[in-house]
Curated annotation (Swiss-Prot):
It comes from Staphylococcus aureus (strain bovine RF122 / ET3-1). The gene is kdpB. It is a multi-pass membrane protein. Mg(2+) binds at residues 513, 517. GO terms for molecular function: ATP binding; ATP hydrolysis activity; magnesium ion binding; P-type potassium transmembrane transporter activity. It catalyses: K(+)(out) + ATP + H2O = K(+)(in) + ADP + phosphate + H(+). The chain crosses the membrane at residues 34-54, 65-85, 216-236, 245-265, 569-591, 611-631, 644-664. It is found in: Cell membrane. This is Potassium-transporting ATPase ATP-binding subunit.
Length: 675
């Protein structure tokens, strides 16, 4: 999806211009009350052009009325363009995704093993298909046989192919991706219209986006201000009549448009849509605008150690026996406990055992494999002769104690030594006898210390949850720079951590990818699920990361904060604009009748007519000038919340007061020659 990342694309601009005219339809524009008021004013001006004296005698020429009409039309078109352009970027992404699933066929595996070519839309969940090198995977599914590299760039934008194989963490495939080597047999998991790609298209094509609570609140405020200014203008007419000041209806219409918050009113929808779009640029799909907005309020982040803070695939680096006599037995037992373990850790133990053991290791072991679970925290194999297990120190010590076994005196010191280095110790037992420890090495991701420091400045606390013991957790937490950690944390413990933080009034975000993460993802205010994760995790979350990079949560939270700050900054600018325009225009209109108003005419505008035209032109131009900021967002990197607030008040608050005075004066210096 990265190929639609440019902010300005000729095709999108043309489409946005077309949509700008379509959105002139009052049925469309009434969704934005502020711009609807502008359109009503434009229609009234058009009536005045056709019937100049319909509301009473006016000294304004038809050409002047036409000028007002054109400027009002352009103002609405600029506002429509900002929204249409933001929507167009999402639709362009949807089109690129739709290309990935067009005209696909599938090689269906019949019950007798024969193949039959069918249309991808005919596939049913539970059917098996075969996809070979150079073919596109026709549906979402799970690899049941084979190993191949798959190009997922059509979905994720990542050019490097990924390896897919049965079992383990990399057996899920997405329809629309391309097999670039070998072959795969896949069990179909979704049917036409319900695939992950279909859901992605529906998400990024959300033109009918529901407004978020903050947007609704702000829109209510802006609508209220619009009504107040309308009341001010309506009362201004009889006051002007009492003072024998002639204020034509067209001028009152223009004054209304200048004073109501048209700037933020024209950009508000674009800011929200662009916020979702910026999340999509990071290959994260937001199920709603509310999800992105809530990210901006997050002040506690729950982070898994494995895959988020460390690279995830812990590698067996050393076997540490309780004594030298146990050396060979430890290697063989570690190998046997891992031979059917499809996890990256299990495979690394098998590789290390083969490298270090001189004699031949058994290839086929007839026994019952016991996989690792979050409850037991151990895995191994039971045969007729022996039982071999590896697992977390506490679990293994408790198991040996329950079976009246002996605990070697040095086993805890070996585990503590591994933990103090930031590694993960796994104790190996054979027939209830402890043989030693496997040292799994964890590597912390680059640049996290700086990123966590940046989050701290923004008022966000980071909490690392890990199944490791307290010593290992403390070492990694200190090295990575997280604020707090929760050691020996099970999936159900994550929910407790989240609820405890929420009870304190915090807004909590977390990442997850497994079925056991689904309850916590649903409980958290923001849940970011991995694309490589289970369906239940993706359904529970409100954000999905296509790159399956848990660290992405940090970027998403920043974008959420940027969205809120952009909306706040442009609202501040718009309201400051209104105040400035009020004091810029009103004295110019009233000073001929009320000489004291001359003192307030600090801009020395040439005439009431040029003042109105200049203000209208400025009002229209400022909308288009702010579109890039609405699309890209204000800068928030590296600053504390207080610093960002001060910067925004200086730039957008003070700037919103000064810019209209300068802009209107410059335009007036040109307009006075034509009015």
């Amino acid at each position: 999806m990265h190929h639609v990342n440019k902010y300005f694309n000729q095709t999108m601009v043309i489409e946005a211009l077309k949509m700008s005219f379509y959105k002139l339809n009052p049925k469309q524009l009434i969704k934005n009350p502020i711009m609807f008021v502008v359109e009503v004013g434009m229609i009234l001006t058009l009536i005045l052009i056709c019937f100049p004296d319909i509301f009473g005698t006016s000294y304004l020429s038809r050409s002047y009325l036409i000028t007002i009409f054109i400027i009002l039309l352009i103002t609405i078109l600029f506002a429509n363009f900002s929204e249409a352009f933001a929507e167009g970027r999402g639709k362009a992404q949807a089109d690129s995704l739709r290309q990935a699933q067009s005209n696909l066929t599938a090689r269906l595996i019949e019950e007798n093993g024969a193949y039959r070519i069918v249309n991808a839309t005919e596939l049913k969940a539970g059917q098996n298909i075969r996809v070979e090198n150079g073919e596109t995977i026709p549906a979402d599914g799970v690899v049941i046989n084979g190993l191949a590299t798959v190009d997922e760039s059509a979905i994720t934008g990542e050019s490097a192919p990924v390896i897919k194989e049965s079992g383990g963490d990399f057996d899920g495939v997405i329809g629309g991706t391309l097999v670039t080597s070998d072959w795969l047999e896949i069990r179909v998991e979704s049917e036409a219209g319900t695939s992950f790609l279909d859901k992605m298209i529906a998400l990024v094509e959300g033109a009918e986006r529901n407004k978020t609570p903050n947007e609704i609140a702000l829109f209510t405020l802006l609508t209220t201000l619009t009504i107040i200014f309308l009341v001010v203008i309506v009362t201004l007419y009889p006051i002007a009549s009492y003072l024998h000041l002639i204020l034509p209806i067209a001028m009152l219409i223009a004054l209304t448009v200048c004073l109501i918050p048209t700037t933020i009113g024209g950009l508000l929808s674009a800011i929200g849509i662009a916020g979702m779009d910026r999340v999509t640029q990071f290959n994260v799909l937001a199920k709603s605008g509310r999800a992105v907005e809530v990210c901006g309020d997050v002040d506690v982040m729950i982070l898994d150690k494995t895959g988020t803070i460390t690279y995830g695939n812990r590698i067996a680096s050393e076997f540490l026996p309780v004594n030298q006599q146990m050396w060979e037995k430890l290697i063989v037992a570690a190998y046997m406990s891992s031979i059917y373990d499809d996890t990256p850790e299990g495979k690394s133990i098998v590789r290390l055992a083969k490298q270090m053991y001189i004699n031949e290791l058994p290839k086929d072991i007839d026994g019952t494999y016991k996989p690792f679970t979050a409850e037991t925290r151990m895995s191994g194999i039971i045969t007729n002769e022996i039982s071999v297990f590896k697992g977390a120190p506490n679990s293994m010590i408790n198991l040996v104690k329950q079976q009246q076994g002996d605990i070697p005196l040095n086993i805890e010191s070996i585990c503590m030594d591994v933990s103090s280095k930031g590694g993960t110790p796994l104790i190996v037992i054979e027939n209830n006898v402890m043989l030693g420890v496997i040292y799994l090495k964890d590597v912390i991701k680059d640049g996290l210390v700086e990123r966590f420091a940046e989050l701290r400045k923004m008022g966000i606390e980071t909490v690392m949850c890990t199944g490791d013991n307290a010593l290992t957790a403390a070492t990694i937490a200190k090295e990575a720079g997280v604020d707090r950690f929760v050691a020996e944390c099970k999936p159900e413990d994550k929910i407790k951590v989240i609820k405890d933080e929420q009870a304190k009034g915090h807004i909590v975000a977390m990442t997850g990818d497994g079925t056991n993460d689904a309850p916590a993802l649903a409980q958290a205010n923001i849940g970011l699920a991995m694309n490589s994760g289970t369906i239940s995790a993706k359904e529970a979350a409100n954000l999905i990361d296509l790159d399956s990079n848990p660290t992405k949560l940090i970027e998403v939270v920043k974008i959420g904060k940027q969205l809120l700050m952009t909306r706040g900054a442009l609202t501040t600018f718009s309201l400051a604009n209104d105040v400035a325009k009020y004091f810029a225009i009103l004295p110019a209109l009233m000073m001929s009748t009320i000489p004291e108003m001359t003192l307030l005419n600090i801009m020395h505008l040439s005439s009431p007519k040029s003042a109105i035209i200049s203000a209208l032109i400025f009002n229209a131009l400022i909308i288009v000038a702010l579109i890039p900021i609405a699309m890209k967002g204000v800068k928030v990197k590296g600053y504390s919340i207080d610093r960002i607030f001060i910067n925004n008040m200086l730039i957008y608050g003070l700037g919103g007061l000064i810019v209209p005075f300068l802009g209107i004066k410059l335009i007036d210096m040109i307009v006075q020659f034509f009015v």
